[in-house]
């Protein structure tokens, strides 16, 4: 007997409901024109990396727990004396999620992490880049359930960029609204 292949909840919802809703709303000529999620990039910059070189590895470990995938340590491209940064010095971590991990992360982000953010009033609907990608920032990484609040010695912020195949911001906004992103009114 063949085992049932795992499919993330949001991907199933996209295939069964969201594609049809977007097709009705924008009446695309071709089924391949319907926008979909391409990737999610999570970036965590560590400003204190100049004083302590171990900070980026600690941040990378937290980011790995959040994303479920090993992050890449980002390094400074050039030296900036004012910030005490040297070329090739580790200054942060980033991870690119695609496929099932992307849908799982988005599910946790929308349903668990964003409601736990203090004084959350909704996402800024103007944070689109003009080409269908959405960027947002989170000030504290402890809103994710994978991070144990008691074991955290320092809180870091992170940038989350949701890349879609949509060509306009309106299409991307409609796609993310269907995924129940809580946009500000």
Swiss-Prot record:
Q: Which GO terms describe its cellular component?
A: ribonucleoprotein complex; ribosome
Give the keywords, sorted: Ribonucleoprotein, Ribosomal protein, RNA-binding, rRNA-binding, tRNA-binding
Domain of life, per lineage = Bacteria
Keyword tRNA-binding in record: yes
Give any Pfam family that matches: Ribosomal_L5
Q: Which GO terms describe its biological process?
A: translation
Molecular function terms in GO for this entry? rRNA binding; structural constituent of ribosome; tRNA binding
The record ties this protein, via InterPro entries, to: Ribosomal_uL5, Ribosomal_uL5_bac-type, Ribosomal_uL5_C, Ribosomal_uL5_CS, Ribosomal_uL5_dom_sf, Ribosomal_uL5_N
Main role? This is one of the proteins that bind and probably mediate the attachment of the 5S RNA into the large ribosomal subunit, where it forms part of the central protuberance. In the 70S ribosome it contacts protein S13 of the 30S subunit (bridge B1b), connecting the 2 subunits; this bridge is implicated in subunit movement. Contacts the P site tRNA; the 5S rRNA and some of its associated proteins might help stabilize positioning of ribosome-bound tRNAs.
What family does the Swiss-Prot or TrEMBL record give for this protein? Belongs to the universal ribosomal protein uL5 family.
Q: How does it assemble?
A: Part of the 50S ribosomal subunit; part of the 5S rRNA/L5/L18/L25 subcomplex. Contacts the 5S rRNA and the P site tRNA. Forms a bridge to the 30S subunit in the 70S ribosome.
Question: Which NCBIfam families does UniProt cross-reference here?
Answer: PRK00010.1 (NF000585)
Q: What is this protein called?
A: Large ribosomal subunit protein uL5
């Amino acid at each position: 007997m063949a085992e049932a292949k795992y499919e993330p909840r949001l991907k199933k919802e996209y295939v069964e409901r969201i594609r049809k809703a977007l097709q009705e709303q924008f009446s695309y000529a071709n089924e391949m024109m319907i926008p979909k999620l391409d990737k999610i990039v999570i970036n965590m910059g560590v400003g204190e990396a100049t004083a302590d070189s171990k900070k980026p590895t600690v941040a990378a470990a937290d980011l790995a727990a959040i994303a479920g995938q090993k992050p890449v340590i980002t390094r400074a491209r050039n030296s900036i004396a004012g910030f005490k940064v040297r070329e090739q010095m580790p200054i942060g971590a980033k991870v690119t999620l695609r496929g099932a991990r992307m849908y799982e992360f988005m599910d946790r982000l929308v349903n668990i992490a964003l409601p736990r953010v203090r004084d959350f009033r909704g996402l800024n609907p103007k944070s689109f880049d003009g080409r269908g990608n959405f960027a947002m920032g989170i000030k504290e990484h402890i809103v994710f359930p994978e991070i144990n609040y008691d074991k955290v010695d320092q809180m870091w912020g992170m940038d989350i960029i949701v890349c879609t195949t949509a060509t306009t911001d309106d299409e991307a906004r409609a796609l993310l609204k269907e995924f129940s992103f809580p946009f500000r009114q």
